[in-house]
A protein has these predicted regions:
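Iron-associated oxidoreductase/ferritin-like identity signal
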Residues: 1-124
Length: 124
């Protein structure tokens, strides 16, 4: 069955993803503090750091563009978390476990967004 990008399922999925992203941020901030660091909560500072490493998210003007942009960001996060996990190896098992759990959620988010886009395009 085809699914419209306007379907209630997409809204529910975005709400779920947003809640999970907040949980990820809280977990990472707590771990940074446990390790003696200071997490960054200022959005302008975060955006500046993201831009410094080549992340320049675009604001979509249509719902489809927004879903595509979100999917690209999720895929970039998968790459970033995977690289961190490889770098950490067995040096910090607690952080590694947190990152593995977040990676699994992020891979699921990407898969769900790709599925919504595919089903939406199949409908056309």
């Amino acid at each position: 069955m085809a699914v419209s990008l306007l379907s209630p399922g997409l809204k529910t999925e975005f709400e779920s993803h947003a809640q999970q992203e907040l949980t990820h941020a809280d977990r990472l901030a707590s771990r940074i503090q446990q390790l003696g660091g200071v997490p960054i909560f200022n959005l302008k500072e975060l955006a500046g750091k993201a831009a410094a490493v080549g992340n320049h998210p675009e604001q979509g003007t249509t719902l489809t563009e927004m879903v595509i942009e979100n999917l690209m960001l999720e895929r970039r996060q998968v790459e970033a978390y995977s690289a961190l996990i490889r770098e950490i190896e067995d040096k910090d098992l607690i952080t590694r476990e947190i990152l593995l759990e977040i990676l699994a959620d992020t891979e699921t988010h990407a898969s769900e967004l790709a599925d919504f886009l595919k089903r939406s395009s199949d409908r056309r």
